[in-house]
Regions:
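Short coil-to-beta-strand transition motifs
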Residues: 19-22, 79-87
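Acidic, glycine-anchored pre-beta loop/turn
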Residues: 54-63, 86
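Non-catalytic terminal segments and appended small domains
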Residues: 1-58, 91-148
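Generic beta-strand or strand-like secondary-structure segments
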Residues: 67, 87-90
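Short, Lys/Arg- and Gly-enriched loop/turn segments at beta-strand edges
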Residues: 72-81, 98-101
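A structural signal for short beta-strand/turn segments enriched in small hydrophobics and glycine
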Residues: 59-71, 115
Length: 148
């Protein structure tokens, strides 16, 4: 897959060009009237090693901007905010027993859920738009780390 890459210090961040993105660090792959979602490479790197992930049950209705699940790292528990209005129709069975797959392969085998979208993908960012936003977020994180 084609992607944008951004290097900052020792970190390299990847943004897939074939996906859409929310400002809340969730990627979206349109699949007809459904969307497959997962956390971005930036989100999983910022949080560190994921030790636990939980997604709401199949059949749960979630509004855009509301939590559809969460993940836990050694540093933080992070809500995963839904990028669309919709109903969860499928949950990645791997993440229950191997949540670290989200760190290893966030855009493929580390996907989180499939949702039947009720709101479409309007308002989501293109890969190019998200890449520019992510670069700003990376710079902000590096400033925090360096204490500037």
């Amino acid at each position: 897959m084609e992607e944008y890459t951004h290097q900052a210090d020792k970190f390299v961040f990847h943004v897939r060009k074939d996906l859409l993105y929310s400002r809340d660090e969730v990627w979206v792959k349109a699949e007809g009237d459904h969307v497959r979602v997962g956390v971005t490479d930036f989100a999983q790197r910022r949080g560190g090693d994921i030790v636990f992930a939980e997604i709401s049950k199949k059949g749960t209705h979630v509004k855009r901007g509301e939590p559809l699940g969460s993940y836990e790292t050694v540093k933080v528990v992070q809500d995963i905010l839904s990028p669309v209005d919709g109903v969860i129709t499928e949950i990645n069975p791997i993440i229950d027993s191997k949540p670290e797959i989200i760190n290893k392969d966030p855009y493929e085998s580390g996907w989180l859920a499939v949702m039947k979208s009720e709101s479409g993908v309007e308002g989501l960012l293109s890969a190019e738009e998200y890449f520019e936003l992510m670069k700003v977020k990376v710079a902000e994180e590096l400033k925090k780390i360096r204490g500037m």
